[in-house]
Amino acid sequence: MDGALLIDKPKGITSTEVVERVKEKLKARKAGHTGTLDPIATGLLIILINKATRFSQFFIGMPKTYRFTVKFGAETDTYDAQGKVVETYEGELNCDKLKEVLNEFRGEILQTPPPFSAKKIKGRRAYELARKGKKVELKPVKITVYSLELLSCNPREKEAEFLAEISSGGYVRSLAYDIGKKLGIGGYMKELRRLKIDEISVEEAVSLEEFLSSENPEEYVLPVDTLFRVIPEVRLNTFEAGKILQGKRILIKNYDYEGLVKIYEDSKFIGIGELKGGVLSPKRLLV
């Protein structure tokens, strides 16, 4: 059984723990998620099963959509509500000023990852160094904030809720921290929910509790190709598919498109390839 599972992750559990429970329930040989959610976060987690794990790289690079709440007036060492408060501020939350500040965080920006993150420094995870009290210096990386919308603003509680679509490599925790810094009153991420990965919605997901209690959990496993919704497809005959399965490139006529494609032998999905200049090259194969 090879495929993908859409789980609505609950709060208070790591993404790795979710994967292990799913793997045990399905008695799968291999399983892996396509982008971690912190324990404090809820929402969409894509878990790939067995041979489908070969396609993880394509999901990791997809944009993600989040709804999140920022608590202003303080900063924490982890940039979220689970961390230790390291700085407090007396200033008020001005909603009009907040709206203006958001303009600086849309589009292509430089963002420094949180010290408590999985980024590596000389071969070691940043969070490993941070937990030991060592100074963590991470370089800013270029990310894209495709959209950033203010959903609500509560000056009395010093909280605001946002909706954002962010490119791969972006951290909502850093976004919350940076917005607070720009306002001059500090801020940290209080809550986070992942709503979408590319065109895949959390509304399509099953809760972890429902999945684990199911007597037929296999019914929730989807063909992995059904999740590549914006990638066009190329259908090959048996001879052409045989060449691709041998790792060879083939010429494709009547296709002006260039980029990633789903490859099918008749109606059977066999993998992801790249089409360029009329030449189809295999990238990852299911068989």
Swiss-Prot record:
Q: Which CDD domains match?
A: PseudoU_synth_EcTruB (cd02573), PUA_TruB_bacterial (cd21152)
Organism expressing this protein natively: Aquifex aeolicus (strain VF5)
GO biological process, any = tRNA modification
Q: Which InterPro entries match?
A: PsdUridine_synth_cat_dom_sf, PsdUridine_synth_N, PUA-like_sf, PUA_sf, tRNA_psdUridine_synth_TruB, tRNA_sdUridine_synth_fam1_C, TruB_C
Q: Which Gene3D superfamilies match?
A: Pseudouridine synthase (3.30.2350.10), PUA domain (2.30.130.10)
Extract the GO molecular function terms from the UniProt entry. Answer: pseudouridine synthase activity; RNA binding; tRNA pseudouridine(55) synthase activity
Q: Where is the signal peptide?
A: none
Kindly report, in one word, the top-level EC class recorded for this enzyme: isomerase
- Name the residues annotated as catalytic in the UniProt entry: 38 (nucleophile)
* Gene responsible for this protein: truB
In terms of superkingdom, the source organism counts as Bacteria
Q: Which UniProt keywords apply?
A: Isomerase, tRNA processing
Q: What is its EC number?
A: 5.4.99.25
A Pfam family that the UniProt record links to this protein: TruB_C_2
Q: Does the keyword Ligase apply?
A: no
Reactions mediated catalytically: uridine(55) in tRNA = pseudouridine(55) in tRNA
Q: Among its keywords, does the record have Isomerase?
A: yes
SUPFAM superfamilies, per database record:
Pseudouridine synthase, PUA domain-like
Record-linked NCBIfam families: TruB (TIGR00431)
Member of which family?
A: Belongs to the pseudouridine synthase TruB family. Type 1 subfamily.
Protein name (Swiss-Prot/TrEMBL): tRNA pseudouridine synthase B
Q: Give the function comment from the record.
A: Responsible for synthesis of pseudouridine from uracil-55 in the psi GC loop of transfer RNAs.
